[in-house]
Amino acid sequence: MNTILVTTSRGLDELLKQEVLTLCPDAQIKQGPGTIQFEGSKEDAYKLCLWSRLANRVIWVLASGKAGDAEALYNTAMGIDWQMQMDSRHTLSVQFIGTNFAIKNTQFGAVRVKDAIVDSFVEQGLPRPSVERKTPDISVYARLHRDNVILGIDLAGASLHQRAYRQETGDAPLKEHIASAMLMRSGWTENTDAPLVDLMCGSGTIAIEAAYIARNIAPGIKRSYWGFTKWLGHEATLWDSLLEDAISVQKPSCGGGIYAGDFSRKMVAIAKANADFAGVFNDISFSQQDATKSSPPVATPGYVVSNPPYGERLGELTSLIPLFSDWGKRFKEAWKGWHVSLLSSNRDLLRVLKLRATKDYAMNNGKLECRLANYVLDEQNTVQFSEDAGNHEFANRLKKNLKRMKGWVKSANTNCYRIYDADLPDYNVAVDRYGDWLVVQEYAPPKTVSEDKARKRLQEVLLHLPAVTGVSPKNIALKVRAQQKGSKQYEKINQSGEMMEVFENGARFLVNLTDYLDTGLFLDHRNTRQKVKALSQGKDVLNLFSYTGSVSVFAAMGGAKSVTTVDMSNTYLDWAKKNVALNKLSGPHAFIQADCTTWLGTHKGKYDLIFIDPPSFSNSKRMQNTWDVQRDHVKMLTDAKACLKEQGTIIFSNNKRGFKLDETAVTALGLQVENITKETIPEDFARKGKIHQCWVLRS
């Protein structure tokens, strides 16, 4: 008898214990987080390699000992007679799990164990074994816990979840042992004659594992690589006998009581290919289908077991929330009497189903902490859920806003405007409409609001927006707006490069709703742009910190003699050129790539009208110094005054909260100061009123 250590994913410990006791009835088990340990025979270890649907590794323990520091670890490893385990011609790898105060990373621990093994051969005058990381002849396993280490031979060689039947996968494949655990926790494995359906099958893992279970196919039967094949302790005759037994107990085809579907034809094709390679193609009925419109394939209720998308990436929520909402409604309409089991790392998405779970289980899918939620679609759970948007606080406020704005929207001559701006403290978002699109900007919640609550509120917003506005969920862009610092204020957050055309007061503009935090058009400056247009007739106009040039467009449309557009970003200057071209404005136009804070101080040109809308703060690498609008605005206006013609005008604006114009210093420059903030705040931003401040400064 020898100590055998079996590992699995967190959350599967109890299931693994039951499985080990089924395969090795006499085992006296010691259970730990993600591990099972017992005294067993080589036959027990081989059975687990071949038959365990839940284990990752089966370790034949060689020794356990002190590992309080690197020297102790080395000595414990040196205490093993490695010449009894492997030949010097064999390749090896060391997998090291755990850290302690002295051994701070697993790579260092693995190297010390490897050094001990190699040195043990060298001391005997034998050649040094070489390292092979992918498919070594001998895979050594080391597990460190506090100051003790367990060392052994990994009989699996590679994780047992790799059944060797998956030829292709999707973007987020489900591990095979997790699929088996889902089937066990769902209750289906106790009633395998019942129909089983996976409505989001991906590469087919759940359905294939179900077919293996129904037909009593050993999960390791197709594996060709094992960690024991070259091990000197391997008993080939015993292993071959177990393989023969496994083949003899396989059941014939289960007759197609397993169903797998996916919205993607490509994934259905991949699932079919994997099932064919696994030898269970005829046991599974495949179909391309939309889960939100699905119906049971048979009249007899059974089990739905699926691994839906989790929404780990922020932008996915806009499509997943309505998907889960529709899916929940479909379950209630069409799947009465069925058992449903869904795995997710996002409990809030599961709540969108509006189903009451009877049980849920923790299990890690890779590094993601997930829950398997079990539902019974009985009478209590299938009462039709129809959430009236008018009865929801956010939806009710949004409807109220849209009703109040209806007349203004008709006369505003634009298809870009704000419809909600954190009107309710619990729903801390801004919602802007751009034609047939909505942009949702989630403000970072205050520290007094928990992340869970903020996430739940955001999901409610995304759920109700399509119903109230009539905008498709696919046309909702989601962004998180926290306080931006330095160069991050214009950083890319996506790479789509997709532009759409919008209009405002007779002008057309290109916006990008997904790639940046801002879209390319500051909606709160709609009135300010009209002010510039009204003052531009026959004037030489300078637009500083020009962004995408919308002010330059209106200056030209207002009859400006010339327009000079200055920005530090070539990307935004190119965008500005496109906006000017889109409106067929002939110029003359000058586009200058420069740091406005230094360019203005050395520029010799003179202008009738200067528009300045700087960032609150910047420390871009392209700038010689940092910029702070509160600290530096007088210097900026001093330089601007030097470029201003007699009887010229500066329009100065910024968005810094709490900003205070140094009127004394500005007046001393010979400029008359007029605060025009109130008239530059558009109707759709009037509820807040503090989106920006704006002044006219006249010489």
UniProtKB/Swiss-Prot annotation:
HAMAP family in the record: 23SrRNA_methyltr_KL
Family, as annotated: Belongs to the methyltransferase superfamily. RlmKL family.
Localization: Cytoplasm
Domain THUMP residue range list: 44-155
Enzymatic reactions: guanosine(2445) in 23S rRNA + S-adenosyl-L-methionine = N(2)-methylguanosine(2445) in 23S rRNA + S-adenosyl-L-homocysteine + H(+); guanosine(2069) in 23S rRNA + S-adenosyl-L-methionine = N(2)-methylguanosine(2069) in 23S rRNA + S-adenosyl-L-homocysteine + H(+)
MF GO annotations: 23S rRNA (guanine(2445)-N(2))-methyltransferase activity; RNA binding; rRNA (guanine-N7-)-methyltransferase activity
Entry GO CC: cytoplasm
Keyword Nuclease set for record: no
E.C. numbers: 2.1.1.173, 2.1.1.264
Gene3D superfamilies, alphabetized: 3.30.2130.30, RNA methyltransferase domain (HRMD) like, Vaccinia Virus protein VP39
Function, in words: Specifically methylates the guanine in position 2445 (m2G2445) and the guanine in position 2069 (m7G2069) of 23S rRNA.
Keywords attached to this entry: Cytoplasm, Methyltransferase, RNA-binding, rRNA processing, S-adenosyl-L-methionine, Transferase
UniProt name for this protein: Ribosomal RNA large subunit methyltransferase K/L
Source organism: Alteromonas mediterranea (strain DSM 17117 / CIP 110805 / LMG 28347 / Deep ecotype)
Gene name in the database record: rlmL
Keyword Transmembrane: no
